[in-house]
Each structure stands twice: as structure tokens, then as C-alpha cells.
Amino acid sequence: MYEVILKRFENPDEVRTFEKGKFELVRLGGMTIGRATYEPGWKWSLHVGQGARSCMVEHIGLVVSGRATAAMDDGRVIEMKPGDVFYIAPGHDSWVVGNEPYVSLHFMGAGQYAQNKPK
């Protein structure tokens, strides 16, 4: 039997909130997809990692709006903008660039990201 499942981020299965941002999750077909929404001034090491140097979650995603930087532990730095499809290996920090909120969809790593944050 074939099945169709429709979900929307307006009614997510889970929301992980933290200062200056949130990460909404939908689960379907054995997969977890996340939508990250970060306000200007958000930085992973300050607002999610709580002082940790690096995010150790592997990400594949798509930038919907805004801009963000990913800084790898080896010194490489990239800026992501709307329409970019990205892969980010473990061992990075990230922050919002500019005065516009940053929104991205995450197809890999969503289930592990910001797990210990209060709901």
C-alpha cells in the first residue's frame, strides 16, 4: 500500500528553542527534517553550543532567507545566502550575517542538532 504524508513547519513535531533562535522538526518516512530560524546576532557557540568551540553535527541543507557564515575548525570560512544548498562537516561554528533573520532547511543532522535545548 502506498501512503502520502503531509506535514507543515507551522505545526512541527518538535521545537527546540534557544536564545535568538529556534529549530523546528518534522518527522516523516523515517527522516527528520529541520527548519532553523536565527535572529541577527545569533552565533552557534554562544546560543546553542554554550561556549563549546565547534558544532559536531554534519549538515546538508538549503538556505531559504538571510545570510550566515560557517567557519570550519581548519580556518576555512564560507558565507551562505538564499538558494545555496550546503554541506557542512562536523567541526564548525556559525553565525548570522547582517540584520535579517536567517532561515534554512536541514535534511541531514536535524535529529541530532540542539538536542539538549529546552523546548
Please provide the spans of the model-predicted regions:
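Glycine- and acidic-residue-biased ligand/ion/polar-headgroup-sensing regions
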Residues: 31, 49-74
